[in-house]
Protein backbone atom coordinates (compact mmCIF):
# COMPACT_ATOMS: atom_id res chain seq x y z
CA UNK A 1 0.00 0.00 0.00
CA UNK A 2 2.84 2.35 0.84
CA UNK A 3 4.53 1.60 -2.46
CA UNK A 4 1.35 2.44 -4.30
CA UNK A 5 1.07 5.67 -2.35
CA UNK A 6 4.67 6.56 -3.15
CA UNK A 7 4.09 5.90 -6.82
CA UNK A 8 1.05 8.16 -6.84
CA UNK A 9 2.94 10.85 -4.99
CA UNK A 10 5.91 10.64 -7.34
CA UNK A 11 3.58 10.77 -10.31
CA UNK A 12 1.94 13.87 -8.94
CA UNK A 13 5.33 15.47 -8.37
CA UNK A 14 6.40 14.62 -11.90
CA UNK A 15 3.21 16.07 -13.33
CA UNK A 16 3.63 19.21 -11.20
CA UNK A 17 7.24 19.56 -12.35
CA UNK A 18 6.12 19.12 -15.91
CA UNK A 19 3.42 21.73 -15.53
CA UNK A 20 5.79 24.13 -13.80
CA UNK A 21 8.41 23.70 -16.50
CA UNK A 22 5.85 24.19 -19.23
CA UNK A 23 4.45 27.28 -17.50
CA UNK A 24 7.87 28.73 -16.90
CA UNK A 25 8.91 28.08 -20.46
CA UNK A 26 5.66 29.32 -21.97
CA UNK A 27 6.22 32.65 -23.62
CA UNK A 28 10.00 32.56 -23.16
CA UNK A 29 11.95 32.91 -26.41
CA UNK A 30 14.79 30.61 -27.28
CA UNK A 31 17.35 33.41 -27.43
CA UNK A 32 16.75 34.47 -23.78
CA UNK A 33 17.15 30.97 -22.28
CA UNK A 34 20.23 30.24 -20.16
CA UNK A 35 22.91 28.50 -22.24
CA UNK A 36 24.38 25.21 -20.98
CA UNK A 37 28.00 26.27 -21.21
CA UNK A 38 27.59 28.59 -18.20
CA UNK A 39 26.94 25.65 -15.88
CA UNK A 40 29.90 23.50 -16.89
CA UNK A 41 29.42 19.77 -16.21
CA UNK A 42 26.06 20.03 -14.48
CA UNK A 43 24.40 18.61 -17.53
CA UNK A 44 26.29 15.35 -17.09
CA UNK A 45 25.01 14.97 -13.54
CA UNK A 46 21.42 14.78 -14.70
CA UNK A 47 19.93 11.31 -13.94
CA UNK A 48 19.57 9.03 -16.87
CA UNK A 49 16.01 8.27 -15.88
CA UNK A 50 15.08 11.86 -16.69
CA UNK A 51 17.00 11.98 -19.92
CA UNK A 52 15.47 8.70 -21.05
CA UNK A 53 11.97 9.91 -20.40
CA UNK A 54 9.63 10.43 -23.33
CA UNK A 55 9.63 14.17 -22.59
CA UNK A 56 13.20 14.44 -23.90
CA UNK A 57 12.19 14.83 -27.53
CA UNK A 58 12.33 17.58 -30.09
CA UNK A 59 8.68 18.38 -29.50
CA UNK A 60 9.16 18.70 -25.73
CA UNK A 61 9.22 22.16 -24.22
CA UNK A 62 12.75 21.61 -22.85
CA UNK A 63 15.41 18.85 -22.80
CA UNK A 64 17.20 19.96 -19.67
CA UNK A 65 16.34 21.73 -16.45
CA UNK A 66 19.11 24.24 -17.16
CA UNK A 67 19.08 24.55 -20.93
CA UNK A 68 16.44 24.61 -23.62
CA UNK A 69 16.96 22.87 -26.89
CA UNK A 70 16.90 25.04 -29.98
CA UNK A 71 13.95 24.04 -32.11
CA UNK A 72 13.76 24.81 -35.78
CA UNK A 73 13.06 28.54 -35.97
CA UNK A 74 12.27 30.16 -39.33
CA UNK A 75 14.78 32.59 -40.67
CA UNK A 76 12.41 35.59 -40.63
CA UNK A 77 11.73 35.07 -36.91
CA UNK A 78 15.30 35.19 -35.65
CA UNK A 79 15.61 39.00 -35.84
CA UNK A 80 12.59 39.83 -33.67
CA UNK A 81 13.75 40.72 -30.12
CA UNK A 82 11.50 40.88 -27.09
CA UNK A 83 9.67 38.50 -24.82
CA UNK A 84 6.66 38.33 -27.12
CA UNK A 85 7.08 38.45 -30.86
CA UNK A 86 4.35 39.22 -33.36
CA UNK A 87 4.94 38.15 -36.94
CA UNK A 88 2.79 39.40 -39.76
CA UNK A 89 2.16 37.17 -42.69
CA UNK A 90 4.41 37.70 -45.73
CA UNK A 91 1.31 38.29 -47.82
CA UNK A 92 0.79 41.57 -45.98
CA UNK A 93 4.37 42.66 -46.60
CA UNK A 94 4.05 42.26 -50.33
CA UNK A 95 2.92 45.08 -52.60
CA UNK A 96 -0.77 45.91 -52.50
CA UNK A 97 -1.70 44.15 -55.70
CA UNK A 98 -4.11 41.69 -54.12
CA UNK A 99 -7.71 42.55 -53.57
CA UNK A 100 -9.13 43.62 -50.25
CA UNK A 101 -11.03 40.34 -49.88
CA UNK A 102 -7.83 38.31 -49.78
CA UNK A 103 -6.17 40.63 -47.28
CA UNK A 104 -9.13 40.39 -44.90
CA UNK A 105 -8.76 36.60 -44.61
CA UNK A 106 -4.99 36.67 -44.07
CA UNK A 107 -4.16 35.35 -40.57
CA UNK A 108 -1.42 36.69 -38.35
CA UNK A 109 0.92 34.18 -36.66
CA UNK A 110 1.53 35.06 -33.04
CA UNK A 111 4.40 33.06 -31.52
CA UNK A 112 5.05 33.06 -27.78
CA UNK A 113 8.24 31.00 -27.72
CA UNK A 114 8.57 27.31 -28.45
CA UNK A 115 5.77 25.81 -30.48
CA UNK A 116 2.90 27.65 -28.82
CA UNK A 117 1.50 29.86 -31.53
CA UNK A 118 -1.92 30.69 -32.93
CA UNK A 119 -3.27 32.67 -35.81
CA UNK A 120 -5.83 35.47 -35.66
CA UNK A 121 -7.59 37.37 -38.40
CA UNK A 122 -6.27 40.86 -38.94
CA UNK A 123 -7.58 43.98 -40.58
CA UNK A 124 -6.19 44.89 -43.96
CA UNK A 125 -3.60 47.63 -44.11
CA UNK A 126 -4.90 50.83 -45.69
CA UNK A 127 -3.79 51.20 -49.25
CA UNK A 128 -2.51 54.57 -50.34
CA UNK A 129 -4.21 55.32 -53.62
CA UNK A 130 -3.36 58.60 -55.24
CA UNK A 131 -6.25 60.42 -56.83
CA UNK A 132 -5.70 62.71 -59.76
CA UNK A 133 -7.23 66.16 -60.04
CA UNK A 134 -9.65 64.87 -62.71
CA UNK A 135 -11.37 62.47 -60.29
CA UNK A 136 -9.72 59.22 -61.44
CA UNK A 137 -7.17 57.00 -59.73
CA UNK A 138 -3.55 57.55 -60.63
CA UNK A 139 -1.38 54.67 -59.45
CA UNK A 140 2.30 55.54 -59.05
CA UNK A 141 1.81 58.95 -60.72
CA UNK A 142 3.70 62.15 -59.92
CA UNK A 143 1.88 64.85 -57.92
CA UNK A 144 -0.15 67.30 -59.96
CA UNK A 145 -0.16 70.15 -57.43
CA UNK A 146 2.22 71.67 -54.95
CA UNK A 147 2.02 71.20 -51.21
CA UNK A 148 1.34 74.95 -50.84
CA UNK A 149 -1.62 74.94 -53.21
CA UNK A 150 -5.01 75.41 -51.64
CA UNK A 151 -7.14 72.33 -52.20
CA UNK A 152 -10.73 73.20 -53.09
CA UNK A 153 -13.68 71.00 -53.98
CA UNK A 154 -14.20 70.30 -57.64
CA UNK A 155 -17.68 71.83 -57.61
CA UNK A 156 -16.40 75.07 -56.15
CA UNK A 157 -13.62 75.32 -58.73
CA UNK A 158 -16.00 74.73 -61.64
CA UNK A 159 -18.49 77.24 -60.25
CA UNK A 160 -15.79 79.86 -59.87
CA UNK A 161 -14.43 79.27 -63.37
CA UNK A 162 -17.94 79.58 -64.80
CA UNK A 163 -18.48 82.86 -62.98
CA UNK A 164 -15.19 84.32 -64.20
CA UNK A 165 -15.91 83.21 -67.76
CA UNK A 166 -19.28 84.95 -67.67
CA UNK A 167 -17.96 88.11 -66.05
CA UNK A 168 -14.90 88.49 -68.29
CA UNK A 169 -16.68 89.93 -71.39
CA UNK A 170 -18.33 92.59 -69.24
CA UNK A 171 -15.04 93.99 -67.95
CA UNK A 172 -14.35 96.27 -70.91
CA UNK A 173 -13.17 99.89 -70.84
CA UNK A 174 -16.62 101.11 -71.92
CA UNK A 175 -18.40 99.29 -69.11
CA UNK A 176 -15.81 100.48 -66.62
CA UNK A 177 -16.39 104.07 -67.71
CA UNK A 178 -20.17 103.64 -67.44
CA UNK A 179 -19.94 102.17 -63.96
CA UNK A 180 -17.55 104.90 -62.82
CA UNK A 181 -19.90 107.59 -64.16
CA UNK A 182 -22.86 106.00 -62.41
CA UNK A 183 -20.93 105.90 -59.16
CA UNK A 184 -19.94 109.55 -59.58
CA UNK A 185 -23.54 110.52 -60.36
CA UNK A 186 -24.69 108.83 -57.16
CA UNK A 187 -22.01 110.52 -55.09
CA UNK A 188 -22.47 114.00 -56.57
CA UNK A 189 -25.80 114.87 -54.84
CA UNK A 190 -24.45 113.88 -51.44
CA UNK A 191 -21.26 115.85 -52.01
CA UNK A 192 -23.20 118.88 -53.22
CA UNK A 193 -25.40 118.83 -50.12
CA UNK A 194 -22.37 118.58 -47.86
CA UNK A 195 -20.56 121.34 -49.76
CA UNK A 196 -23.61 123.60 -49.67
CA UNK A 197 -23.79 123.31 -45.90
CA UNK A 198 -20.08 124.02 -45.52
CA UNK A 199 -19.95 127.05 -47.83
CA UNK A 200 -22.51 129.11 -45.89
CA UNK A 201 -21.34 131.30 -43.00
CA UNK A 202 -23.18 133.66 -40.69
CA UNK A 203 -21.67 137.00 -39.65
CA UNK A 204 -23.24 138.86 -36.72
CA UNK A 205 -22.62 141.78 -34.35
CA UNK A 206 -22.65 144.74 -36.76
CA UNK A 207 -25.02 147.59 -37.55
CA UNK A 208 -27.31 147.54 -40.61
CA UNK A 209 -25.44 150.49 -42.09
CA UNK A 210 -22.22 148.45 -42.18
CA UNK A 211 -23.42 145.72 -44.57
CA UNK A 212 -21.52 147.04 -47.59
CA UNK A 213 -18.34 147.43 -45.53
CA UNK A 214 -18.77 143.90 -44.25
CA UNK A 215 -19.25 142.43 -47.73
CA UNK A 216 -16.15 144.19 -49.03
CA UNK A 217 -14.17 142.96 -46.05
CA UNK A 218 -15.21 139.32 -46.38
CA UNK A 219 -14.77 139.37 -50.14
CA UNK A 220 -11.04 139.32 -49.47
CA UNK A 221 -11.26 135.67 -48.34
CA UNK A 222 -12.88 134.52 -51.56
CA UNK A 223 -15.73 134.96 -53.97
CA UNK A 224 -19.07 135.59 -52.24
CA UNK A 225 -21.66 133.88 -54.43
CA UNK A 226 -24.77 135.06 -52.60
CA UNK A 227 -25.89 136.57 -49.32
CA UNK A 228 -29.11 136.93 -47.35
CA UNK A 229 -29.78 139.85 -45.02
CA UNK A 230 -32.89 139.79 -42.80
CA UNK A 231 -35.06 142.89 -42.52
CA UNK A 232 -34.55 143.05 -38.77
CA UNK A 233 -31.38 141.79 -37.20
CA UNK A 234 -27.66 142.32 -36.86
CA UNK A 235 -26.50 139.30 -38.87
CA UNK A 236 -26.02 138.25 -42.48
CA UNK A 237 -25.68 134.88 -44.24
CA UNK A 238 -23.00 134.64 -46.91
CA UNK A 239 -22.13 131.82 -49.26
CA UNK A 240 -18.66 131.30 -50.69
CA UNK A 241 -17.73 129.48 -53.86
CA UNK A 242 -15.74 126.79 -52.01
CA UNK A 243 -15.34 125.36 -48.53
CA UNK A 244 -11.79 126.70 -48.13
CA UNK A 245 -12.92 130.30 -48.46
CA UNK A 246 -15.68 129.70 -45.93
CA UNK A 247 -13.19 128.27 -43.44
CA UNK A 248 -10.98 131.31 -43.91
CA UNK A 249 -13.94 133.58 -43.19
CA UNK A 250 -14.79 131.61 -40.03
CA UNK A 251 -11.24 132.19 -38.82
CA UNK A 252 -12.07 135.92 -38.59
CA UNK A 253 -14.43 135.21 -35.69
CA UNK A 254 -14.03 137.69 -32.84
CA UNK A 255 -12.22 140.38 -34.83
CA UNK A 256 -12.71 144.13 -34.55
CA UNK A 257 -14.57 145.70 -37.46
CA UNK A 258 -14.00 149.25 -36.25
CA UNK A 259 -13.27 150.90 -32.94
CA UNK A 260 -16.77 150.20 -31.56
CA UNK A 261 -17.88 146.91 -33.24
CA UNK A 262 -16.80 143.32 -32.67
CA UNK A 263 -18.05 140.77 -35.18
CA UNK A 264 -18.48 137.02 -34.94
CA UNK A 265 -18.40 134.46 -37.74
CA UNK A 266 -19.85 130.95 -37.42
CA UNK A 267 -21.05 128.26 -39.79
CA UNK A 268 -24.61 128.72 -40.99
CA UNK A 269 -27.20 126.39 -39.42
CA UNK A 270 -30.38 127.73 -41.06
CA UNK A 271 -31.63 124.91 -43.30
CA UNK A 272 -33.88 127.19 -45.34
CA UNK A 273 -30.94 129.37 -46.26
CA UNK A 274 -28.76 126.36 -47.06
CA UNK A 275 -31.42 124.80 -49.28
CA UNK A 276 -32.06 128.13 -51.02
CA UNK A 277 -35.74 128.31 -50.03
CA UNK A 278 -35.35 131.36 -47.77
CA UNK A 279 -36.52 134.73 -49.01
CA UNK A 280 -34.18 137.64 -49.49
CA UNK A 281 -31.22 135.70 -50.90
CA UNK A 282 -29.35 138.00 -53.27
CA UNK A 283 -26.97 136.58 -55.84
CA UNK A 284 -23.85 138.67 -56.20
CA UNK A 285 -23.57 138.40 -59.99
CA UNK A 286 -22.56 142.04 -60.24
CA UNK A 287 -19.63 141.39 -57.95
CA UNK A 288 -18.60 138.43 -60.07
CA UNK A 289 -18.69 140.56 -63.22
CA UNK A 290 -16.77 143.31 -61.45
CA UNK A 291 -14.15 140.82 -60.36
CA UNK A 292 -13.87 139.52 -63.92
CA UNK A 293 -13.53 143.06 -65.27
CA UNK A 294 -10.96 143.86 -62.61
CA UNK A 295 -8.88 140.83 -63.54
CA UNK A 296 -9.15 141.71 -67.25
CA UNK A 297 -8.04 145.27 -66.62
CA UNK A 298 -5.10 144.05 -64.59
CA UNK A 299 -4.10 141.73 -67.43
CA UNK A 300 -4.35 144.57 -69.95
CA UNK A 301 -2.24 146.82 -67.77
CA UNK A 302 0.43 144.15 -67.56
CA UNK A 303 0.39 143.74 -71.33
CA UNK A 304 0.64 147.50 -71.90
CA UNK A 305 3.55 147.84 -69.51
CA UNK A 306 5.35 144.98 -71.23
CA UNK A 307 4.84 146.57 -74.65
CA UNK A 308 6.08 149.93 -73.34
CA UNK A 309 9.24 148.32 -72.01
CA UNK A 310 9.84 146.67 -75.36
CA UNK A 311 9.43 149.99 -77.21
CA UNK A 312 11.88 151.74 -74.85
CA UNK A 313 14.45 149.03 -75.45
CA UNK A 314 13.96 149.32 -79.21
CA UNK A 315 14.48 153.11 -79.13
CA UNK A 316 17.55 152.72 -76.97
CA UNK A 317 19.11 150.24 -79.38
CA UNK A 318 18.38 152.48 -82.38
CA UNK A 319 20.03 155.47 -80.70
CA UNK A 320 23.09 153.46 -79.82
CA UNK A 321 23.43 152.15 -83.37
CA UNK A 322 23.05 155.60 -85.00
CA UNK A 323 25.59 157.35 -82.74
CA UNK A 324 29.33 156.97 -82.56
CA UNK A 325 29.25 155.94 -78.94
CA UNK A 326 31.61 153.13 -78.13
CA UNK A 327 29.62 150.07 -77.04
CA UNK A 328 31.76 147.67 -75.09
CA UNK A 329 29.17 144.89 -75.38
CA UNK A 330 29.03 145.09 -79.18
CA UNK A 331 32.81 145.32 -79.52
CA UNK A 332 33.34 141.95 -77.90
CA UNK A 333 33.84 138.85 -79.96
CA UNK A 334 30.60 137.01 -80.65
CA UNK A 335 32.21 133.73 -79.70
CA UNK A 336 32.75 134.99 -76.16
CA UNK A 337 30.12 135.25 -73.50
CA UNK A 338 28.32 138.56 -73.62
CA UNK A 339 28.54 140.88 -70.65
CA UNK A 340 24.77 141.22 -70.69
CA UNK A 341 24.35 137.53 -70.01
CA UNK A 342 25.84 137.94 -66.52
CA UNK A 343 23.08 138.07 -63.94
CA UNK A 344 23.32 141.20 -61.77
CA UNK A 345 26.25 142.66 -63.76
CA UNK A 346 26.14 146.26 -64.90
CA UNK A 347 27.10 146.82 -68.56
CA UNK A 348 30.06 149.07 -69.33
CA UNK A 349 28.05 151.53 -71.41
CA UNK A 350 25.39 152.08 -68.76
CA UNK A 351 26.40 155.69 -68.12
CA UNK A 352 26.31 156.49 -71.82
CA UNK A 353 22.82 155.03 -72.12
CA UNK A 354 21.46 157.00 -69.21
CA UNK A 355 22.91 160.20 -70.62
CA UNK A 356 21.43 159.55 -74.05
CA UNK A 357 18.00 158.72 -72.61
CA UNK A 358 18.06 161.83 -70.42
CA UNK A 359 19.03 164.03 -73.41
CA UNK A 360 22.23 165.38 -71.90
CA UNK A 361 25.27 164.93 -74.11
CA UNK A 362 28.28 163.50 -72.49
CA UNK A 363 31.04 166.12 -71.89
CA UNK A 364 34.62 165.05 -71.65
CA UNK A 365 36.41 166.53 -68.68
CA UNK A 366 39.72 168.15 -69.49
CA UNK A 367 42.60 166.54 -67.67
CA UNK A 368 44.44 168.76 -65.19
CA UNK A 369 48.00 167.70 -66.07
CA UNK A 370 50.90 170.10 -66.81
CA UNK A 371 51.23 168.96 -70.40
CA UNK A 372 47.51 169.52 -71.03
CA UNK A 373 47.75 173.07 -69.62
CA UNK A 374 50.66 173.75 -71.98
CA UNK A 375 48.70 172.57 -74.99
CA UNK A 376 45.71 174.66 -73.91
CA UNK A 377 47.93 177.74 -73.64
CA UNK A 378 49.34 177.22 -77.10
CA UNK A 379 45.87 176.60 -78.46
CA UNK A 380 46.48 173.26 -79.94
CA UNK A 381 44.00 171.59 -77.74
Swiss-Prot record:
<dbReference type="GO" id="GO:0017056">
    <property type="term" value="F:structural constituent of nuclear pore"/>
</dbReference>
<keyword id="KW-0131">Cell cycle</keyword>
<dbReference type="GO" id="GO:0007096">
    <property type="term" value="P:regulation of exit from mitosis"/>
</dbReference>
<feature type="domain" description="RRM Nup35-type">
    <location>
        <begin position="195"/>
        <end position="275"/>
    </location>
</feature>
<dbReference type="InterPro" id="IPR012677">
    <property type="entry name" value="Nucleotide-bd_a/b_plait_sf"/>
</dbReference>
<dbReference type="GO" id="GO:0044613">
    <property type="term" value="C:nuclear pore central transport channel"/>
</dbReference>
<keyword id="KW-0539">Nucleus</keyword>
<feature type="compositionally biased region" description="Polar residues">
    <location>
        <begin position="82"/>
        <end position="135"/>
    </location>
</feature>
<keyword id="KW-0811">Translocation</keyword>
<dbReference type="GO" id="GO:0009792">
    <property type="term" value="P:embryo development ending in birth or egg hatching"/>
</dbReference>
<feature type="region of interest" description="Disordered">
    <location>
        <begin position="1"/>
        <end position="26"/>
    </location>
</feature>
<dbReference type="GO" id="GO:0006999">
    <property type="term" value="P:nuclear pore organization"/>
</dbReference>
<dbReference type="GO" id="GO:0051301">
    <property type="term" value="P:cell division"/>
</dbReference>
<dbReference type="GO" id="GO:0044615">
    <property type="term" value="C:nuclear pore nuclear basket"/>
</dbReference>
<feature type="region of interest" description="Disordered">
    <location>
        <begin position="77"/>
        <end position="149"/>
    </location>
</feature>
<keyword id="KW-0653">Protein transport</keyword>
<dbReference type="InterPro" id="IPR035979">
    <property type="entry name" value="RBD_domain_sf"/>
</dbReference>
<keyword id="KW-0509">mRNA transport</keyword>
<comment type="similarity">
    <text>Belongs to the Nup35 family.</text>
</comment>
<dbReference type="GO" id="GO:0006997">
    <property type="term" value="P:nucleus organization"/>
</dbReference>
<dbReference type="GO" id="GO:0005635">
    <property type="term" value="C:nuclear envelope"/>
</dbReference>
<dbReference type="GO" id="GO:0031965">
    <property type="term" value="C:nuclear membrane"/>
</dbReference>
<keyword id="KW-0813">Transport</keyword>
<dbReference type="Pfam" id="PF05172">
    <property type="entry name" value="RRM_Nup35"/>
</dbReference>
<keyword id="KW-0498">Mitosis</keyword>
<dbReference type="GO" id="GO:0005643">
    <property type="term" value="C:nuclear pore"/>
</dbReference>
<keyword id="KW-0472">Membrane</keyword>
<keyword id="KW-0906">Nuclear pore complex</keyword>
<dbReference type="InterPro" id="IPR007846">
    <property type="entry name" value="RRM_NUP35_dom"/>
</dbReference>
<protein>
    <recommendedName>
        <fullName>Nucleoporin NUP35</fullName>
    </recommendedName>
</protein>
<dbReference type="GO" id="GO:0051028">
    <property type="term" value="P:mRNA transport"/>
</dbReference>
<comment type="function">
    <text>Functions as a component of the nuclear pore complex (NPC). NPC components, collectively referred to as nucleoporins (NUPs), can play the role of both NPC structural components and of docking or interaction partners for transiently associated nuclear transport factors. Thereby required for nuclear import. Required for the proper organization of chromosomes on the mitotic spindle during anaphase.</text>
</comment>
<dbReference type="GO" id="GO:0005543">
    <property type="term" value="F:phospholipid binding"/>
</dbReference>
<keyword id="KW-0132">Cell division</keyword>
<dbReference type="GO" id="GO:0006607">
    <property type="term" value="P:NLS-bearing protein import into nucleus"/>
</dbReference>
<dbReference type="GO" id="GO:0003676">
    <property type="term" value="F:nucleic acid binding"/>
</dbReference>
Amino acid sequence: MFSHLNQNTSGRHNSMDLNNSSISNFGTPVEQSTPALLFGKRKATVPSSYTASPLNTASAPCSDIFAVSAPAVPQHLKDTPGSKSVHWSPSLVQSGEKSAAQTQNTPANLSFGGNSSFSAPTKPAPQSIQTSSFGGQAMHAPPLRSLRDKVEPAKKISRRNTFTARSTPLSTPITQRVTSRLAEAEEQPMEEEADAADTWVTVFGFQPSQVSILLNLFSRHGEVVSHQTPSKGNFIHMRYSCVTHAQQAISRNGTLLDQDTFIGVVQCTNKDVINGSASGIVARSSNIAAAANRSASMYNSFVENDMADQSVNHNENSVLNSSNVFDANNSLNSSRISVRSGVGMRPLAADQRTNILQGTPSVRKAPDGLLNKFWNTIGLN
